[in-house]
Amino acid sequence: MAKKSKIAKAKKQQAMIAKYAPIRQALKEAGDYEGLSKLPKDAHPSRLKLRDQTDGRPRGYMRKFGMSRIRFRELAHQGLIPGVKKASW
């Protein structure tokens, strides 16, 4: 489980990215790079660290499922992820 402060920071950052996305796009199309540099640093999408939706784990993140490899394995073994089953050959 990640620290609650890190999870809260990630949520705040996602909100900021969504808020500034149209402004950022308009400035990029206009070629106003000075205006872009005046936007908050955390408003840039590349600064966001993807985290597990259930417990906030930052590493081992699987984009397709939105969770960490550990949580994915637990839920897959329980059969809670549709279309996923343990490989056997």
UniProtKB/Swiss-Prot annotation:
Disulfide topology: none
Compositional bias segments (type: Basic and acidic residues): 39-58
Keyword Ligase: no
InterPro entries per record: Ribosomal_uS14, Ribosomal_uS14_bac/plastid, Ribosomal_uS14_sf
A GO BP entry: translation
GO cellular component: cytoplasm; small ribosomal subunit
Region: Disordered, residue numbers: 38-61
Alphabetized Pfam families for the sequence: Ribosomal_S14 (PF00253)
UniProt-recorded Gene Ontology molecular function terms: rRNA binding; structural constituent of ribosome
Keyword Ligase: no
Lineage top rank: taxon: Bacteria
Record note on quaternary structure: Part of the 30S ribosomal subunit. Contacts proteins S3 and S10.
NCBIfam families named among the record's database cross-references: PRK08881.1
Family, as annotated: Belongs to the universal ribosomal protein uS14 family.
Function: Binds 16S rRNA, required for the assembly of 30S particles and may also be responsible for determining the conformation of the 16S rRNA at the A site.
Protein known as: Small ribosomal subunit protein uS14B
Organism for this UniProt entry: Enterococcus faecalis (strain ATCC 700802 / V583)
